[in-house]
A protein has these predicted regions:
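Catalytic-domain carbohydrate-binding cleft regions of carbohydrate-active enzymes
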Residues: 1-183
């Protein structure tokens, strides 16, 4: 496969360096070669569509983590769509950043020349983005622990609630909540 070849060729040419790559195509065994990415999602033309797109990422990330690649992420801020009214998007931006802090990899990304720096969304959004990013850094020892577990067992960092609470039947019908590790 492409990802296997890229990894092998990189390691051949750079024996003392680790390779990092992301893919949105997946099949069994791919987790040995790459990080998963859900692909381009959009915010649409208005804030309402953006909320739906962000909500859609959670079940996609959980499914990918369970079935294909335990290290899977999404484009924080939604990637596609014009942002014409930054103040109107501030709350959505804040929630994207907060949700993204609990992705195995946090990556703010948007298409073209659309700027997504926190300060563009106002002081409150900037403050909240900073807090989420600082939390992610404080969690690094925890993340490393569960990343090791994911490597050894295949259990993802982002986990559906039913993995931790299998006796609670309600956890099997929710796809909007998740655990980050088991604690």
């Amino acid at each position: 496969t492409w990802d296997k070849v890229v990894k092998e060729q990189f390691e051949k040419r750079n024996p003392n360096r680790r390779v990092f790559q992301m893919t949105r195509a997946a099949f069994a065994g791919l987790q040995r070669y790459t990080f998963g990415w859900t692909g381009d999602c959009g915010n649409g033309d208005d804030v309402t569509q953006g909320w739906g797109q962000m909500a859609n990422q959670i079940p996609v990330l959980l499914s990918a983590g369970l079935g294909i690649i335990p290290f899977t992420t999404c484009d924080i801020t939604g990637y596609c769509g014009d942002i014409e009214d930054y103040p109107a998007m501030a709350e959505l931006y804040t929630r994207w950043i907060q949700m993204g802090a609990f992705n195995p990899l946090s990556r703010i990304h948007h298409e073209g020349n659309v700027a997504v720096e926190p300060w563009l969304f106002g002081e409150e959004a900037e403050k909240n983005a900073k807090a989420a990013i600082e939390l992610k850094y404080r969690l690094l020892p925890y993340i490393y622990t569960y990343a090791r577990e994911a490597h050894e067992t295949g259990l993802p960092l982002m986990r559906p609630m039913f993995l931790e609470y299998p006796a609670d039947m309600e956890t099997f019908s929710t796809d909007a909540l998740f655990m980050f590790g088991s604690e």
